[in-house]
Design a protein with these regions (language model features):
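N-terminal Rossmann-like or analogous alpha/beta NTP/dinucleotide-binding catalytic cores
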Residues: 6-133, 233-244, 302
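Active-site cores that bind ATP or allylic diphosphates and position pyrophosphate for catalysis
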Residues: 113, 117-270, 278, 289, ...
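A conserved active-site cap/scaffold subdomain adjacent to cofactor or substrate pockets
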Residues: 289-371
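Short alpha-helical scaffolding segments that buttress acidic/His motifs in well-ordered protein cores
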Residues: 307, 351, 386-389, 393, ...
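Amphipathic alpha-helical/coiled-coil segments positioned at domain termini
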Residues: 459-466, 471-484
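Conserved small/polar residues in nucleotide/adenosyl-binding loops
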Residues: 485-493
């Protein structure tokens, strides 16, 4: 098991999403862990947009990525929208950089031109399949194919002069032991003969992910590459690329997967739809409308706190932490390799805790933005209501469910609660409620008056208050009698 001893040096990390659609919480957690490791050492968090595949790019996706990071309080130090010494920060604007670097690899003999057409490669695959084999473009097959390794320099020069289409492939060495090191998963070894000669530069002159990724990480002086587990199979190739260039490798860390609640399969949009919960931080309004955690009433503090626990936990055992405290306590070495199950109920628990510590005025503003009816309420009254009910709310949306009866007549009445109300004395109770409304001095005076009348008539204070609560709330749950009376009854005439 590899053991990397860190010194408290500044770290440059990057989050490098592709704008191919909305970024779900797996990507957000990757961004969060990168951000935490940078801020813990006073380093830099870079947002780099990997948009070389224009065919898959989705309009609005880059803005969505920036918006969700900002909502969570994760602000890049360097990005397409900020100035930085290592830009541009969109890969589509860095083709001149990749052209220079690919030439260096070709000139040093670590990469070569391949002129095979798609049809010719398809034919090779078909022939191999007939023999029960798998076609791999590598040390065994490359010299029988159309490339600068199997042709003379004159033939290659002639094809290039004529404008023959080509790709640039990486020359993977034969039978070399590749040692990879990962903070989370330790050391591993792989034989290079298992790898194919990956395309580094496509026929249209754009780089592939692997090439652009390594070049940018080096030129942007990235010290730690923290990314998802799905990139583990690419690690050996990336190590070879660093060695071919003669560059120092960054420290790698591959984060564990986030699984469905039942532990079966990677968390996805479909699993969220089936489970009735979002998997995206904020609403996505592309061709397909997708609901976000923000619009479901989750606070960014609650979401960030929960995501931090998916694969990591603080040594001191504390659970409820804001972004500042997470930054202070986070240790990349404590991230585990085992996958984490997504638990929406646990997320709501974290959200509940953060609602308790959030100013009621801020909660009221958020509630107004999410609920049309709440938007019609005078803010001061809504703040008072939120203060009364927030102890029982798991989401911002819950606040309205708990407080709406304070401003509107109940839309329905709970059947079990109605059965506990005395039908015989109901008319008398309602009449007395109206009478007490007219002559009360205060909310507490109103409640005491009703209790006194209940004792005097023999109906009983308990039955009086139960009936009053059902009339006002539609059920037997709610805030204290004095509180809801103060908020629900109109001013004394």
């Amino acid at each position: 098991m590899i053991k990397i001893i860190f010194i408290n040096t500044l770290r440059r990390v990057r989050f490098a999403p592709s704008p191919t659609g909305p970024l779900h919480i797996g990507g957000l957690r990757t961004a969060l862990f990168n951000y935490l490791i940078a801020k813990k050492t006073g380093g830099s968090f870079i947002l780099r947009i990997e948009d070389t595949d224009k065919k898959r790019e989705v309009a609005g996706a880059e803005k969505y990525i920036v918006d969700e990071l900002n909502w969570c309080g994760i602000f890049p130090d360097e990005s397409p929208g900020t100035k930085g010494a290592f830009g541009p920060y969109r890969q589509s604007e860095r083709n001149h950089v990749y052209s220079d670097e690919i030439k260096k690899l070709v000139d040093s003999g670590h990469a070569y031109y391949a002129f095979d057409s798609e049809e010719e490669l398809a034919s090779c695959r078909s022939e191999c399949e007939k023999r029960g084999e798998t076609f791999i473009y590598n040390y065994e097959s490359r010299h029988a194919l159309k490339n600068s390794l199997s042709m003379s320099k004159a033939e290659v020069a002639d094809l290039l002069k004529k404008g023959k289409a080509y790709v640039v492939r990486f020359l993977v060495p034969k039978n070399k032991n590749i040692r990879t090191a990962d903070i989370i998963r330790g050391e591993s070894n792989i034989n290079s003969s298992l790898l194919d000669d990956k395309v580094l530069m496509k026929a249209d002159g754009t780089p592939t992910y692997h090439f652009a990724n390594v070049v940018d990480d080096h030129l942007m002086k990235i010290t730690h590459v923290i990314r998802g587990e799905e990139w583990l199979p690419s690690l050996a190739l990336h190590v070879l690329l660093y060695e071919a260039f003669g560059w120092e490798k960054p420290i790698f860390a591959h984060l564990p997967l986030i699984l469905n609640p039942n532990g079966k399969g990677k968390l996805s949009k479909r699993s969220g739809e089936k489970g009735g919960f979002p998997v995206f931080p904020i609403d996505w309004s592309g061709d397909t409308k997708l609901k976000g955690f923000r619009e479901a009433g989750i606070l960014p503090e609650g979401l960030v706190n929960y995501l931090a626990t998916l694969g990591w936990s603080p040594e001191e055992g504390r659970e409820v932490l804001n972004l500042g405290k997470l930054t202070e306590l986070f240790l990349l070495e404590n991230v585990v390799s085992s996958a984490a199950n997504f638990d929406f109920e646990k997320l709501k628990w974290y959200n509940h805790k953060h609602i308790q510590t959030t100013d009621s005025s801020k909660l009221a503003e958020l509630l107004k933005s999410l609920n049309k009816n709440a938007g019609e309420i005078v803010k001061e009254k809504l703040v008072d209501a939120v203060t009364l009910v927030k102890e029982r709310a798991n989401t911002i949306s819950d606040l309205w469910g708990l407080a709406s009866y304070l401003f509107f007549d109940p839309a329905s009445f709970d059947e079990k609660s109605l059965k506990k109300v005395s039908k015989d004395g109901l008319e008398k109770i309602v009449s007395e409620i109206i009478s007490q409304c007219k002559k009360r001095e205060s909310a507490s005076n109103f409640v005491e008056g009703l209790k006194y009348w209940g004792d005097e008539t023999g109906i009983g204070a308990g039955q009086i208050m139960m009936t009053t609560r059902v009339i006002l709330t539609g059920g037997l749950t709610g805030v204290g009698a004095v509180s809801y009376t103060h908020l629900t009854l109109p001013p004394k005439a």
